[in-house]
């Protein structure tokens, strides 16, 4: 029972990081229709930045906060390159984000090398259902809940959120009523970058990161977002938590070597189910 509880709770913690990464993808896609394949790079860049800031004597909390702000700034710059030029299409934006992701690889290797890095998180542990759980996992869960609830309130209850929602629903109509669609797109990239950066900052104390860690994050985040068709944050959260728990169970009872395959199989199953449902609707 103790092992099962440990796998479930740690899986929820890691799943929250996947949900944050996937939520960043959803925000960007809903507003710009661009699939941002540099999303994982935001997470890695911010996590590695924290290691440098802490080594320079910047205190915990401030270092993580500055790194998340950096993620937002890098996200906005990514958006400027991907969609800033008039006439760009979602397809060209996707290609740009792929290229920027490769550039991020090179920068991260140049600045931090290719060895995995980590930094200390919230210390201590608690006993839950007979399992000793690192307190940092509870921090990940709590921060994710607060951030995603805040994001939902932003979209539902503020003028800025309504402008983002209007742009996502119909960019042409948004322009007609005076909404700056490009500004909303850049803001979406900034929010996506901050969410990705937050995911990296939260997960690094329990999972080391290196320049290529973005692959696992973006695969799992994209798999979570696929459950919600890249447009539904609640299903993205559910997908991230499901992936985190299943991967923790697979890693605990079988082997950690199969964890990435879990995300790929999940994505494949969702796509097949969606295609089958579409065929049934068309036949009817």
What is the predicted role of each segment?
Residues 25, 58-100, 107, 239-243:
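Alpha-helical transmembrane segments within multi-pass membrane transporters and channels
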Residues 41-42, 79, 84-109, 214-226, ...:
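Pore- or pathway-lining transmembrane helices of multi-pass membrane proteins that form conduits
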Residues 85-157, 184, 254, 283-284:
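Transmembrane helix-bundle core of multi-pass membrane transporters
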Residues 18, 22, 59-69, 189-196, ...:
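Transmembrane alpha-helical segments in multi-pass inner-membrane proteins
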Residues 1-21, 49, 58-63, 89-94, ...:
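Membrane-interfacial amphipathic/re-entrant helices at transmembrane-helix boundaries
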Residues 10, 14-15, 132-210, 233-238:
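Helix-loop-helix "hairpin" substructures at the membrane interface of multi-pass membrane proteins
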Residues 24, 88, 111, 169-183, ...:
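Cytosolic-side transmembrane-helix boundaries in multi-pass membrane proteins
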Residues 3-55, 78-88, 92, 227-234:
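Single transmembrane alpha-helix segments in multi-pass membrane proteins
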């Amino acid at each position: 029972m103790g092992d099962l509880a440990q796998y479930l709770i740690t899986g929820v913690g890691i799943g929250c990081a996947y949900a944050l990464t996937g939520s960043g993808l959803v925000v960007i896609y809903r507003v710009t229709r661009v699939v941002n394949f540099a999303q994982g790079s935001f997470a890695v860049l911010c996590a590695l930045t924290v290691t440098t800031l802490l080594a320079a004597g910047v205190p915990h909390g401030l270092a993580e906060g500055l790194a998340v702000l950096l993620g937002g700034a890098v996200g906005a710059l990514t958006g400027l390159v991907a969609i800033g030029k008039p006439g760009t299409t979602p397809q060209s934006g996707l290609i740009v984000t792929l290229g920027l992701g490769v550039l991020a690889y090179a920068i991260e290797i140049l600045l931090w090398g290719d060895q995995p890095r980590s930094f200390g998180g919230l210390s201590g542990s608690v006993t839950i259902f007979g399992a000793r759980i690192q307190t940092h996992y509870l921090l990940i869960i709590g921060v994710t809940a607060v951030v995603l609830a805040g994001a939902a309130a932003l979209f539902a209850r503020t003028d800025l959120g309504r402008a983002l929602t209007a742009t996502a629903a119909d960019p042409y109509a948004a322009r007609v009523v005076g909404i700056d669609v490009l500004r909303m797109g850049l803001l979406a990239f900034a929010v996506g970058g901050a969410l990705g950066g937050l995911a990296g900052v939260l997960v690094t104390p329990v999972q080391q990161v290196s320049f290529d860690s973005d692959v696992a994050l973006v695969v799992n985040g994209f798999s979570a977002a696929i459950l919600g068709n890249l447009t539904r944050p609640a299903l993205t959260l559910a997908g991230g938590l499901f992936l985190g728990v299943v991967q923790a169970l697979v890693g605990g009872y079988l082997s950690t070597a199969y964890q990435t395959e879990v995300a790929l199989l999940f994505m494949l199953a969702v796509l097949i189910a969606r295609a089958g449902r579409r065929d049934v609707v068309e036949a009817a």
